[in-house]
Structures are given as structure tokens and as C-alpha cells.
Amino acid sequence: MVPKADSGAFLLLFLLVLTVTEPLRPELRCNPGQFACRSGTIQCIPLPWQCDGWATCEDESDEANCPEVTGEVRPHHGKEAVDPRQGRARGGDPSHFHAVNVAQPVRFSSFLGKCPTGWHHYEGTASCYRVYLSGENYWDAAQTCQRLNGSLATFSTDQELRFVLAQEWDQPERSFGWKDQRKLWVGYQYVITGRNRSLEGRWEVAFKGSSEVFLPPDPIFASAMSENDNVFCAQLQCFHFPTLRHHDLHSWHAESCYEKSSFLCKRSQTCVDIKDNVVDEGFYFTPKGDDPCLSCTCHGGEPEMCVAALCERPQGCQQYRKDPKECCKFMCLDPDGNSLFDSMASGMRLVVSCISSFLILSLLLFMVHRLRQRRRERIESLIGANLHHFNLGRRIPGFDYGPDGFGTGLTPLHLSDDGEGGTFHFHDPPPPYTAYKYPDIGQPDDPPPPYEASIHPDSVFYDPADDDAFEPVEVSLPAPGDGGSEGALLRRLEQPLPTAGASLADLEDSADSSSALLVPPDPAQSGSTPAAEALPGGGRHSRSSLNTVV
């Protein structure tokens, strides 16, 4: 029976479907190439970790609905552990997988690099391994490993040995003795205890550490052995072919310690930052990995107390990728987000902006120049009007009417004056005024009259300091009615008296053109007969004989 749309059975059926089906996943901010966990504090993990046999998400959603992995299952006990990613190394066989029955804690630093570049990390012993292909004897190889804070490798478990045999070590083109099989110096020595029917001896650890190690089986001795050698050094022989390597085929050899061979170094795991630098204990650093915004503390060779910075999503970009070396730096993967055309457009915009700025600046400078030019023209017109007011529009000879001559002639004007304040508007302090002389009015070159002559006009020709310079002049007055004698007397009186140090001509020139000498009143008209008196130079001077009228 199909429920009706308006009945409550349809609502119950819909709720049942929502309960049974998979809940909708929230929108997580995971980058491309990452797996989004359904719930928990860990939201994003690398995509290769999905279905790898080790639950990384807290809800184990990365191992849900995964195909079953067939392989050999080995039980483990105690603190013994194996590498959960064994068999997934370079060149390894994915089907050769060792399951772990011990619960592994989900750690935020489980994917971070704990060894420097070139070293292979093994989680079971928290150690790093590296093969050096340069041919050295046993003792030189041991010193090389010690300089790297390690030693020649020893093995504590069979799983550790399997991990070393499964690795594909770097193979340069020209390596020492590199063939289908290789021998590596390791940290064991075989001590001879007897030479009866056969060589008898025991294995010893050359460099003892804090952890327990297992001893190899009886070795294969070298074909050429010296009877004086009682100590032989161990060599681990492994094969280069992947088929033989993943079947754990290997052998132990006891060789002379002075033979040259490749060697295997082992060191404890350490904190390595994103720039492949070894970090000391207790220091903050950014571990190696895909998150450069992670900050951790180095403790026991592992990053702990990690704090991650959340970066804001880049604006205007739908698909992007994080920079693996710099925090909060993204690379846009949109078709036109990082194209050559976009770069060229940005460059063209920059060029156009520079040209526009240059044109605007040029226009401003041109406008300032035009304003100053108009102000100069207005000032010149004001000066012309000023000259027309004082000289009836006639141009003054010798006056500079150009812009450079402003202020040198009649009533100068400043360039900053726009003329609105009046023709004679000045700024403090005012410029010096220059007196103007009209060219059509001839100015006399004679000096002004003496000061004494201005005060006492009667003594214009008298200088008390020059009493001795004047000689008395006798003047005989004619009788009344003698016209000829009167005219002669008048002519004598009009002549200036000679002075010491000055000629008569100088005295004539020094007199003002508007001055005139008047003759005393006629004795015949006044009714009195004047007595003849001596002129200056005698014992008594006459001060009423001459009058000067200006």
C-alpha cells in the first residue's frame, strides 16, 4: 500500500530513509589530493592514506568500505611493533602487507618527516637508516657513521631487518661494487675462538647501545683468510632484484675488516624542519610535510604539541593549491587565474597608469605656466595704465617695459599682485621708490643758493669769511638830472662783484635765472641826496644797497 502524501506514514518513511542512508558530509576545507574525514578533530588527511590498513581518522572513515588486503599476518607482542606502511616503499610489493593487532594512537605528527633527506625512517624502532655506496674499510665506515650522530646498523627484531631488505636504496651510476647483489658493512664482528677442525667463534656487537639486538647466524667466511686474523667484520649481503629482495633473501659474511665495501648507517630519529635542518630537543620548528603553517615542539625526536594556523581562502579563486614551503600562500589553478594573458594585462595596466600620471602632471604644470603668464600680462597692462596716467600715454625713454624691468621704473608692481587691490598695491616691505624726471623739462645744473642767502637776502653776495677777498669799489653818483650818468651807474650795479676763488662768470652762472638786481630808489624822486659809500672791502659795509628778489 502506497501511503498518501497527506498521511503521517510518508513522513515516517522519509525519516527512516534519512536514518539508514549515509548522512551528508559537511563542507570541509580540504585541498585537492586529500581525504575528508567524516567527523573528529582531524578533518583532512593525504589521499594515499585511505584504505592503507591503518585508521588515521578518529571515526576510521578512511578505512571504511575498503577491499580486503590479503597477506601474511604476523602476531606481535609486548612493545614490539612493525612499520604499518611496510611494503609500500618505493619498488615494494603492495600485496606484501603486515597487519598490526596493537592499537596505534592517531597522532597529528604521524605523517611528518623524522629523518633528514636521504634517510629512511622505521617507526618500529624510531630509527633512520641510510646506505653509503662509497667504498671504505670497516673502521673508516664506522667513523663516518659516528660523524652523522649514528653508528653501523644493528638489528633488534626480524621485522627491522625485513624493513632494511625491502628498501630500494639510491643507486648512482658509478657506485662501488654495485651489481645484482651488494654487501654492506654492519655493526657486528665475528671473533675466532678456535681453529681445530673448523673455525669456531661467536658474534659480538661492535658498538653496543641501550637496546637489545639479535645476533646473526653462522657466517660465510671469505675464501682467502689469514691465519693471523682473529677478528672478522660482518657484511650483510642483499640483492638488487625486487623479486629476491621482497622474499627476504639475504646472507651474512665474515670478511677482513680492511676490505673496502659499502656500509649501512643507523641513527635515532630526530626532529627535522621543513628546510631539512635537524632541530634540537625542546625547540619549536615547522616539521616536514604538506602543511607549512604547523608549529611543533621537538620532544624525543618527534614533533609534539603542534599548533596549526588556519588560512583564509583566497578571494576570486575557485581552485587553488597551497604552497608546500610557505604558510598561507596559494597558487590559483583557475584557467585564467594565473595565465600569461593575465600577466600581460597586469603589465599593460601598469604602463597605462604610468603614462596617465605623466600626462596629468604635464597638464598641471602647463596650467601653472599659463596662469603665471596671464598674471604677468595683467601686471604689464597695469603698469602701462600707470604710465599713461602720469605721462599722458607717452612711453618713457629708457624705461624697460618687459617683464624683467618690472619694479625698476615708475612705481613697480609685484608678480604676485593681481591688480585687484589697486595699481599701487605693495607687499611689506615696499620696494624703494625712484624719483622720475620728465625729459622735456630742463633742470639747471647749478647748485642751490647758500643757506645764508636764503635767510638774509640782502647779503647774497657777502661772505664774512671773505672780507679780504673783496676790494672796495668806488661808485660816484651823478648829479640829479644826469640821465647818461644814471644809465651808466645802473649798468655798473648790474655787474656782479668779484669774489676770491671764483670768477665773475661763475657768479653769473650761480645766480638763479628768475632773480633780478634792483636799483636803489632815485634820490631825485625821494627827495634826499644819498651819500657816496664804499662797497664791501672798506671799513664799513652797506647792507641796504642791493635787494634780491626770487
UniProtKB/Swiss-Prot annotation:
Listed Gene3D superfamilies: Low-density Lipoprotein Receptor, Mannose-Binding Protein A, subunit A
Amino acid composition bias (Basic and acidic residues), ranges on this chain: 71-92
Signal peptide residue numbers: 1-20
An example molecular function term from Gene Ontology annotations: carbohydrate binding
Transmembrane intervals: 350-368
Topological domain spans for side Extracellular: 21-349
Pfam families, per the entry: Ldl_recept_a, Lectin_C
Domain of life: Eukaryota
Residue ranges of every copy of the C-type lectin domain listed in the record: 115-241
PROSITE patterns: C_TYPE_LECTIN_2, LDLRA_1, LDLRA_2, VWFC_1
Subcellular location: Membrane
Modified residues (Phosphoserine): S381
Chain intervals for the UniProt region annotation (Disordered): 69-92, 500-550
Domain LDL-receptor class A: 28-68
SUPFAM superfamilies named among the record's database cross-references: C-type lectin-like, LDL receptor-like module
Entry keyword set: Cell adhesion, Disulfide bond, Glycoprotein, Lectin, Membrane, Phosphoprotein, Receptor, Signal, Transmembrane, Transmembrane helix
Location of the VWFC domain: 270-333
Tissues expressing this chain: Predominantly expressed in brain, heart, lung and fetal kidney. Low levels in liver and adult kidney.
Cytoplasmic topological intervals: 369-550
Disulfide pattern: C30-C44, C37-C57, C51-C66, C145-C265, C233-C257
Membrane topology: Single-pass type I membrane protein
GO biological process, one term: cognition
Coiled coil stretches, renumbered: none
Glycosylated residues in this chain: N149, N196
Name listed for the protein in its UniProt record: Integral membrane protein DGCR2/IDD
Organism: Homo sapiens
Underlying gene: DGCR2
